[in-house]
From Swiss-Prot:
Lineage: Bacteria, Bacillati, Mycoplasmatota, Mollicutes, Acholeplasmatales
Enzyme nomenclature, EC number: 1.1.1.94
Catalytic residues identified in the record: K188
UniProt-listed NCBIfam families: PRK00094.1-2, PRK00094.1-4
Gene this protein is translated from: gpsA
UniProt-annotated binding residues for NADPH: S10, W11, K101, A136, R252, V276, E278
Descriptive protein name: Glycerol-3-phosphate dehydrogenase [NAD(P)+]
């Protein structure tokens, strides 16, 4: 099968290598000439790893015409514009596999909804999300990883499962809860930033364990609000993804929070990051959700004040600790 990857970043290039390992043909489209050059010279653009069997192009139309399936690996802030460009050039049905995690601020739309907005109905064949606890740094080293492919279309999620699964390092489960899987993957990035902030500020493992536990409850609230299944938040795409993202120095969101907690200005942290910190947009979107619906997300709401309104980490922690004492309610 032929797969075009839109976005030659760390994750897109790594998944292209997985597909090549599994015997498929892959073509990466990217707007960065240097990234395209590296890929065509068998060099991963972000890691010190050799890649094989992957071709890259600067020509979007070439990548669209080439593909049986299109893998969306661009940051969610660029997703709508990228889809508009794809829609203008497409001449046949498109089958999308999204691997980006985010919710659009203001509109509060998931990536699947943005796809529906921007792709002409006659051209939209099917959509799936591939998500779960995964660092590209480990997958490119072919270390054991387990993901979930979710879609409303049964044959398509099973096709994605077969596409990425192998017997050496990657296993994929399927889910019919597209909403729950998309939302869990987006909101966990916000909690990961908070985890990094607390670690950078000097708090210990006790605090991190509490944060992850309370954070998963905020993920559950958002999943249920969107119409997803509560149970999904306790699987790979929710708590699984949260654990790996909120406790690892390989996580760009955790590392961004870590630097903020250590006192580095937010603007400097974001400008110096080589990769997009998706958790910042997730925090913004979640705050918009709180304002528009009244849903209660205390951890994310107080983190919004740190990121966007210059509240100190010390004050944020104090605000959380001085909230009204309550009985623990699970979900």
């Amino acid at each position: 099968m032929k797969i075009s990857v839109i976005g030659g970043g760390s994750w897109g290039t790594t998944l292209a290598q997985v597909l090549t390992d599994n015997g498929h043909e892959t073509l990466i489209y990217d707007v960065n000439p240097e990234a395209v050059k590296k890929i065509n010279n068998n060099i991963h653009p972000f890691f010190d790893n050799k890649i094989t069997g992957i071709r890259a192009t600067l020509d979007l139309k070439e990548s669209i015409d080439y593909a049986d399936y299109i893998l969306l690996a661009v940051p969610t802030k660029f997703m709508r514009d990228s889809l508009r460009d794809i829609n203008k050039l497409a001449t046949r049905k498109l089958y999308f596999i999204n691997v980006s995690k985010g919710i659009e601020p203001v509109t509060l739309k998931r990536v699947s909804e943005i796809v529906t907005d921007e792709i002409t109905p006659e051209l939209l064949g099917a959509y799936a999300v591939l998500t779960g606890p995964s660092h590209a740094e480990e997958v490119i080293e072919r270390k054991l990883t387990v993901l979930t492919a979710a879609s409303d279309v049964e044959w398509f999620r099973k096709s994605v499962q077969q596409l990425f699964s192998n017997q050496s390092y990657l296993r994929v489960y399927t889910s019919d809860d597209l909403i729950g899987c998309e939302v869990g993957g987006a909101i966990k990035n916000a909690i990961a930033i908070v985890s990094g902030m607390m670690t950078g500020y000097g708090l210990g493992e006790n605090a991190r364990a509490a944060l992850i536990t309370r954070g998963i409850l905020e993920i559950v609230r958002v999943v249920v609000h969107y119409g997803g299944k509560k149970e999904t938040a306790f699987g790979l795409t929710g708590i699984g993804d949260l654990i790996v993202t909120a406790s690892s120095y390989n996580s760009r969101n955790f590392n961004a929070g870590l630097k903020i907690g250590q006192g580095t200005p937010v603007e400097q942290v974001l400008s110096e990051s080589k990769m997009v910190v998706e958790g910042v947009r997730a925090i913004q979107a979640a705050k918009d959700l709180c304002v528009q619906t009244g849903i209660e997300l205390p951890i994310i709401e107080i983190t919004y004040e740190v990121i966007f309104n210059n509240m100190s980490v010390k004050e944020a922690i104090q605000n959380l600790l001085t909230r009204e004492l309550k009985e623990e309610v699970i979900a």
